[in-house]
Amino acid sequence: MATISFSHNHQSSDNRRGGSHHHRHGPVVEEIEGLIKVFNDGCVERPPIVPIVSPTIHPSSKATAFDIKLSNDTWTRVYIPDAAAASPSVTLPLLVYFHGGGFCVGSAAWSCYHDFLTSLAVKARCVIVSVNYRLAPEHRLPAAYDDGVNVVSWLVKQQISTGGGYPSWLSKCNLSNVFLAGDSAGANIAYQVAVRIMASGKYANTLHLKGIILIHPFFGGESRTSSEKQQHHTKSSALTLSASDAYWRLALPRGASRDHPWCNPLMSSAGAKLPTTMVFMAEFDILKERNLEMCKVMRSHGKRVEGIVHGGVGHAFHILDNSSVSRDRIHDMMCRLHNFIHPS
């Protein structure tokens, strides 16, 4: 898994000077350096910082992958372990995964996600559907949540359709054993999609949501936590406080504060009906204290929550950091995910 370095120096429109920041689309009004640039006329630029890869997987990886287009805006990448593909009678848990990127960047085809999910499908023995959802600011929230719910609905409809849909791979999925997962903003999406699904009860007879897996979930709030205030963490983390604030400005409905329930679920949905939840946190992540508080509040509402803090690593280390420390933590994460998906 390649190491990817991000420079998260945020620049707002009021601290730029000179003509270098002007463009045929007008001045830049929001920028997270190296990741996204938003112009006055609404034009958005996203530099190609991470390679986009096809679903091709080397045979030694012991899995297959392919893409399925659902609409003009949404598609999925499906990962199936060879162990399941080789046996017609084998069915595996289904894990629906949402990539991170502050709701504003990222892709299910990014090489770092492709590598991680290929490995996860094999080591956790599950079929993975990785969702490529609409991005902000062109599509502000709740667009990503809507896309997530629509993917779950599509899976259910394909499973029960007399036409079969994609039987060759759906026959490998056990819809009575489904998990929603994601990292960073993708973990936020997994959480909000789970809240919607559980509240609606729409799929109760066709889909059993067994658990939620939140890796470094991207939540926020107007009040700062201690880990958000400790700026030295920014040197070890892929997410800085200024970048976090910029992502929320671009993703939330216009005029909303960081106490909006989509950003700060403690304001509304911490008591929502949810299945067992596993939350991964990182020592040098600015989100650590907020995630710990989220676990505490969910437990106080009677939820079953397992929280894990990995030491010596920062935000999204599992896809961005190839150090020996990170590799050790990734191995631990994979083992815990396997045991969560396949409880003894």
UniProtKB/Swiss-Prot annotation:
The enzyme class is hydrolase
Q: Which UniProt keywords apply?
A: Hydrolase, Serine esterase
Q: Where are the residues of the annotated region Disordered?
A: 1-24
Write out the biased-composition intervals (Polar residues): 1-10
Q: Where are the catalytic residues?
A: 184, 285, 315
Chain's role: Carboxylesterase acting on esters with varying acyl chain length.
- What tissue expression does the UniProt record report for this protein? Expressed in leaves, stems and flowers.
- GO MF annotation, one: carboxylesterase activity
Gene, per the UniProt record: CXE17
Catalytic activity reads: a carboxylic ester + H2O = an alcohol + a carboxylate + H(+)
Q: Does the keyword Hydrolase apply?
A: yes
Its protein name is Probable carboxylesterase 17
- The record's disulfide annotation reads none
| The protein's Enzyme Commission number | 3.1.1.1
Which Pfam families does this chain map to? Abhydrolase_3
Which family does this protein fall into? Belongs to the 'GDXG' lipolytic enzyme family.
Q: Which InterPro entries match?
A: AB_hydrolase_3, AB_hydrolase_fold, Carboxylest/Gibb_receptor, Lipase_GDXG_put_SER_AS
Position of motif Involved in the stabilization of the negatively charged intermediate by the formation of the oxyanion hole?
99-101
Source lineage: Eukaryota, Viridiplantae, Streptophyta, Embryophyta, Tracheophyta
